[in-house]
Amino acid sequence: VDNLELTAPGLVLRPWRDEDAAVVLVELADPEIARWNAQGVTDLPQARAWVRRRADWSSGTHVSLALTDAADGRLLGGASLHQIQDGDAAIGYWTAAAARGRGVASRAVTALTAWGFGELGLHRVQLWHAVDNEASCRVAERSGYRLEGVLRESHRYGDGRRHDEHLHARLATDP
């Protein structure tokens, strides 16, 4: 999968590269990303390490891809399948501020999920997000992930408080 490249309308999902680090540093400092996906990246060396961790798929438990604009190659965000084990996985994503509200995350999640079902033979992919993160709920719904329930106070987010989370999932057998 080292040379994996997926496409979705207007997007290319590709492996992370060292040159992505400068954009990652700027985007992960965005308050909306820090609120829901605090990464602790505060300087360029940390951003380079962050990119290298995501580019290293050797454990077999995750596949992380950069989301780029198909027209100009600009970095628009990231998406990953992680916790891959026994036919199950979780999916996560983030989008750059300039890419929000354009369906980037939904298109990426749909493409990466289809690849996971087809190429990895996954049966179930889960997606969870803070109940207050309405944008992520829309991504889940638009990508065919069904709401299964609420995980009470299940995760501490960037604000330091525990939040309830929505649990969504898609099965390979779902339409």
Give residue ranges: language-model regions:
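GNAT-family acyltransferases
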Residues: 1-98, 119, 161-175
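Glycine-centered small-residue hotspots that permit tight backbone geometry or close packing
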Residues: 61-64, 80, 103, 108, ...
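Conserved acetyl-CoA-binding loop-helix of GNAT-fold acetyltransferases
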Residues: 94-95, 101-118, 134-142
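Conserved phosphate-binding and hydrolysis motifs of nucleotide-dependent enzymes
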Residues: 77, 133, 144
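Conserved beta-strand edge residues that scaffold enzyme active sites
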Residues: 42, 65, 130-131, 154
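Conserved active-site tyrosine of GNAT-family acetyltransferases
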Residues: 140, 145, 168
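Short, basic (Lys/Arg/His-rich) helix/loop patches that form interaction surfaces
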Residues: 118, 124-127
